[in-house]
């Protein structure tokens, strides 16, 4: 309760004093117990209310959780299964909602789509067997299933349509392009939207009918994917004051979140397009690099160029947990992302200076072991599979690495 109420130092001291194991996450359970106790003194129906409030959802939910055992692997247990190379720095990536496909984008203006099952099969096949493959077999088994060329400048962001075989891409060439990747022969986009500024970020609505776009401009765009009509919020005074750097829909589609160079995080109503809350100077005024929602849409996870990762509770509009220990040598030069793993037990964040993966227990901010990411340059993108223990890292060293936690064989 102390942790939840913002008394982080007191909570840690008390936790150390009573030797709490595992460490206690922030929770308002004590407040709720007292509240229900007072209610039950007045009416006997209080116990029914408690029962109705105990059903836990999947993923992180600090409102109901007490002692949750992590069943998924920490970051240090993953290993590289496949590496693909571009001809320039690789700074964009995306995971399909099925967890079966990955896309990577580069400064060389190309996009690759990779098959996860093929990458896993390739890593499990002995080199001598791969050497014996015919050219036809090699092509059929190759993890890169599509290479798309239609941008004329750096690919900055990617997102898969949730239900159709469509990939959306944004670029510094001022365009958003839509690729139909189910046809092997197609390398060009079937539709292009010309923007007024370089495109920085985009996010598909969970239905796939709308696309959020952030460009080198303070105004967030919302495109109808069927008509390609553009909408913007009708109250400019509440918008960002500097270019938008990150956009993300909530899984329940009721909200979306944005971050900006102005240092603010804004949460918007997904229907009215109006700002409903603003976290001012969310990262001490530094640029906000990423925002993402928890699966139950109750929390926003963010990171900024102050090298801090924060969990925000939307019901109270405040920062609930700060994950510290990354970027010990100072502020970040490049942007990166903080992501949940597939079970939301852990939070992954690439440390720019050490090129290693920082990992925390999402509920109590306990630092886990570091994982060396093996890149020869800063990691510019990290994305975790929504369905299994796998993630992708894209780097300034022109490479994208696919990581997977292999099941124990003993």
Which residues fall in each region the model found?
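Eukaryotic modular interaction domains in large regulatory/scaffold proteins
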Residues: 287, 328-383
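Beta-strand-rich domains and repeat architectures in extracellular enzymes and scaffolds
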Residues: 83-109
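Eukaryotic adaptor/scaffold assembly regions
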Residues: 1-82
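Blade-level signature of beta-propeller repeat domains, shared across WD40, Kelch, NHL, RCC1
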Residues: 380-410
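Per-blade loop-tip surfaces of WD-repeat and WD-like beta-propellers in eukaryotic adaptors/scaffolds
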Residues: 69-78, 113-145, 152, 164, ...
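Loop/turn segments within WD40 beta-propeller blades
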Residues: 93-99, 158-164, 202-209, 248-254, ...
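Conserved strand-to-loop turn within each blade of WD40 beta-propeller repeats
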Residues: 105-108, 170-173, 214-217, 259-262, ...
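Canonical WD40 repeat/beta-propeller blade segments in eukaryotic WD-repeat proteins
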Residues: 88-94, 153-159, 196-204, 241-249, ...
């Amino acid at each position: 309760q102390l942790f939840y109420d913002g008394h982080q130092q007191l909570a840690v001291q008390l936790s150390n004093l009573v030797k709490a194991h595992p460490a206690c996450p922030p929770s308002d359970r004590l407040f709720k117990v007292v509240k229900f106790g007072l209610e039950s003194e007045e009416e006997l129906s209080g116990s029914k209310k408690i029962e109705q409030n105990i059903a836990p959802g999947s993923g992180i939910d600090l409102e109901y959780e007490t002692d949750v055992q992590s069943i998924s692997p920490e970051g240090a247990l993953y290993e590289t299964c496949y590496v693909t190379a571009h001809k320039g720095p690789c700074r964009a990536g995306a995971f399909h909602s099925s967890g079966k496909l990955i896309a990577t984008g580069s400064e060389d203006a190309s996009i690759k789509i990779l098959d996860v099952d093929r990458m896993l099969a390739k890593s499990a096949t002995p080199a001598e067997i791969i050497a014996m493959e015919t050219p036809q077999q090699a092509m059929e088994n190759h993890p890169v299933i599509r290479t798309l060329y239609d941008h004329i400048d750096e690919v900055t962001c990617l997102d898969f349509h949730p239900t159709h075989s469509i990939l959306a891409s944004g670029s510094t060439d001022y365009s958003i392009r839509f690729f139909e990747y189910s046809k092997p022969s197609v390398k060009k986009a079937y539709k292009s939207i010309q923007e007024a500024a370089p495109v920085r970020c985009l996010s598909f609505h969970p239905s796939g009918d709308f696309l959020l776009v952030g460009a080198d401009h303070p105004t967030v765009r919302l495109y109808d994917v069927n008509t390609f009509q553009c909408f913007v919020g009708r109250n400019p005074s509440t918008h960002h004051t500097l270019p938008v750097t990150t956009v993300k829909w909530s899984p329940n589609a009721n909200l979306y979140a944005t971050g900006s160079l102005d240092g603010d995080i804004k949460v918007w109503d997904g229907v009215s397009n109006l700002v409903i809350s603003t976290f001012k100077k969310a990262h001490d005024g530094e640029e906000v690099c990423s925002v993402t929602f928890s699966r139950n849409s109750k929390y926003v996870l963010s990171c900024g160029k102050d090298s801090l990762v924060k969990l925000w509770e939307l019901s109270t509009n405040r920062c609930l947990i700060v994950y510290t220990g990354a970027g010990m040598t100072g502020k970040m030069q490049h942007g990166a992302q903080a992501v949940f793993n597939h079970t939301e037990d852990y939070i992954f964040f690439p440390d720019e200076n050490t090129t290693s993966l920082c990992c925390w227990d999402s509920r109590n901010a306990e630092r886990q072991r570091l994982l060396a990411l093996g890149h020869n340059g800063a990691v510019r993108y990290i994305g975790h599979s929504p369905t299994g223990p796998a993630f992708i890292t894209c780097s300034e060293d022109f490479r994208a690495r696919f990581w997977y936690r292999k099941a124990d064989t003993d």
